[in-house]
Amino acid sequence: MDYGVEDIYHYLNTTENDTYPSTMLKNMECGAAMLARHIANNDKILLVVDDDCDGFTSSALLMNYLHMLFPYFVENNIQYYIHEGKKHGILSADIVMPDIALVIAPDSSSNEYALHEQLAQQGIDILILDHHKAPHYSQYACVINNQLDDYPTKSLSGVGVVYKFCKYLDEQLDVEYADLFLDLVALGITADVMSMCDYETRYLVSNGLEHFRNPLIKALYAKTEFSINKSGGLSPYNLAYYIAPFLNATARVGTVKEKTILFESLLEFKAYDQIASTKRGCAGQMESVVEQAARNCTNIKSRQTKERDIDYELIESMIERQNLLQNKILLIQMEQGEPAIAGLIANLLVAKYHHPTLILYKMGDMWQGSARNDSRYGLEDFRQFMRDCDLVNFAEGHESAFGTQIANENIDKFIEYSNKALQDYEFSPVDRVDFIINANQLTSEFILDIGKLHYIWGQEISEPLIAIEHIAITNDNLSVIGKKEDTIKIMLPNGISLMKFGSTEDEIEALTPDTSTGCVTINALGVCNINNYNDQEYPQIIINEYEIVGRQSYYF
């Protein structure tokens, strides 16, 4: 396994010494002085909440922190703005009311140079706490951005930059409040799929996972705790997989009211306020903001999943009918559908077909939507590839996940250009395994040692993939279990069980030997797991995929 971590022992035992001084971020002093001046002047401040999990947690952390210092000021002088639909940045000066003296944009706006100038000319200060790449610093805003200077930890997301800002305020005010919100830091960083390789990021996220304080995080964890524990317990990966999607779904397809309830449920001083219940059959009753937000998140995520599945099925038929996989970039043009979930569907298509993928929706003479890519399959920076071709109006966001727009007249030209530029790329499915082991040599100790590291798995510190060869399946060691009778269990002679969940009847039939003395031989790819039962640890391999390599009527 090679994760780019130089010292594994150090990585597993990070301390506060692995964090860097906040002053290593350029403009930290300027930003703190700007905020302090407006608080001292009792000015009105506008906080622009960015439309994803990192954006919501970034703004919530700042609000919670400032409320501990200046509760009256925060409740009376700071307004927050949430865009309708899924949008990023300040976007327009129209959202800034005449009485606003300072605009704060956590997790966005580094490259909105013209808007910064426009607001500055109106006498409005702008404080940006961001992590997105931009060509340069803005002349008209105070920008604190770990991507624009020499700050070593590039894997901090927006909420990480906000945290560093609050740590600086801690030092100036001789308080220790910032670390109280590390659960928000952990959620935002993992939701934004930031690398977990850096020692500082590892330290912040692992500490955030140790204790949940935030009302909404606690409520969503209570809903997902069983699934999380079944998947090995809390880890950066499980936080991103089980909890972050609730916030991202609401940010994508929720109404402004639903998103406002969500944001307020992240605020410790608002989360337990009583509001009119929207629960079916509870008209006239009251409930807390966080209770309503947690239920909304669940319903919205379910609604989003249904919309995603409908559009995904339509897109799959388009891919086959139009032979779109003949192109190097999988470009889908949608006349209808829900643009807010384009990124979700694009992720599924990248996982299945391994091509860089664009899902674009018609908007007048333009096609606009989401781009996704997996750099493991060859193209390291999809966003830069699109920017370099001069056929794209914009490509804004992260290297492998961003929004883009192409003029209708340039679609065919872009396809032709990309096919030529990427002609040497295969984008074929490749499973990069960490270990190849014969089934007879697989040991319980090996599985338990890896399984006990579940708490570190995250982006770029991925769970090891194990290739197990020559697994002999007989009627004696094969069983089908579970309420739905769709879980295949293969028990090896040394007590290790191989589990395949969600199996079809055809799979079960294919893996069942033809005779009572027969054998089916498979090779499998899977991950290590520990099944805790009656205070005992049992080693398991969870099978992701397999191939049948042999079948015989007699096995000895």
Model-derived features: positions:
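Short alpha-helices
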Residues: 137-191, 397-398
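Mid-to-C-terminal polyanion-binding domains and interfaces
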Residues: 37, 41, 199, 284-333, ...
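Short, acidic/small-residue loops that bind anionic groups at enzyme active sites
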Residues: 124-139, 356
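Short acidic, glycine-rich surface-loop motifs adjacent to enzyme active sites
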Residues: 102-108
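Generic beta-sheet signal
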Residues: 106, 129-131, 144-146, 360
